[in-house]
């Protein structure tokens, strides 16, 4: 079982202050209740069956879920891919302010980077599942766990995929096991 570190509340309070300040100027997110988003970010950890050493977050935006997962999974090396310059600058600032040494921010689309295999890939409401798998090709292998934060209607996106879905309120947490040689028309 993955435990919440003792400094998590302090870290999330700092994050919330930083995001509120940046959001007034840069409109990084439309979320009003950051505590709900933080809770949503960490909720699927109870179903994660292993402690990853390497993880990728695709389309990291304002840091949900990756920043909070990185706060908890401190021994995991995180790469956050965010092509939007103001959002990636914000993420870099948060990384420095919160001293998140296990986080690297990549200011580019994942498909523009040299592939490397991660043990965990996360993404929150970025795009359709099979499109995400296409752009992440080369970053996963048969052992990689993919965790997607999806809305209430996700089943049609998962045809032909090995998926476990955990539903909470209007959120579906989808854990995928995808073979490295997965093809869209399988």
UniProtKB/Swiss-Prot annotation:
Signal peptide: none
Binding, S-adenosyl-L-methionine: 59, 64, 110-111, 124
Pfam families associated with the record: GidB
Documented EC number(s): 2.1.1.170
Any GO molecular function: rRNA (guanine-N7-)-methyltransferase activity
GO cellular component terms, A-Z: cytosol
Disulfide bonds: none
Taxonomic superkingdom: Bacteria
Reactions that this protein is recorded to catalyse: guanosine(527) in 16S rRNA + S-adenosyl-L-methionine = N(7)-methylguanosine(527) in 16S rRNA + S-adenosyl-L-homocysteine
This protein's UniProt keywords: Cytoplasm, Methyltransferase, rRNA processing, S-adenosyl-L-methionine, Transferase
UniProt cross-references to SUPFAM superfamilies, sorted A to Z: S-adenosyl-L-methionine-dependent methyltransferases
Localization in the cell: Cytoplasm
Enzyme's top EC category: transferase
Function: Specifically methylates the N7 position of guanine in position 527 of 16S rRNA.
Family, similarity comment: Belongs to the methyltransferase superfamily. RNA methyltransferase RsmG family.
Name assigned to this protein: Ribosomal RNA small subunit methyltransferase G
Native source species: Campylobacter curvus (strain 525.92)
Gene that encodes it: rsmG
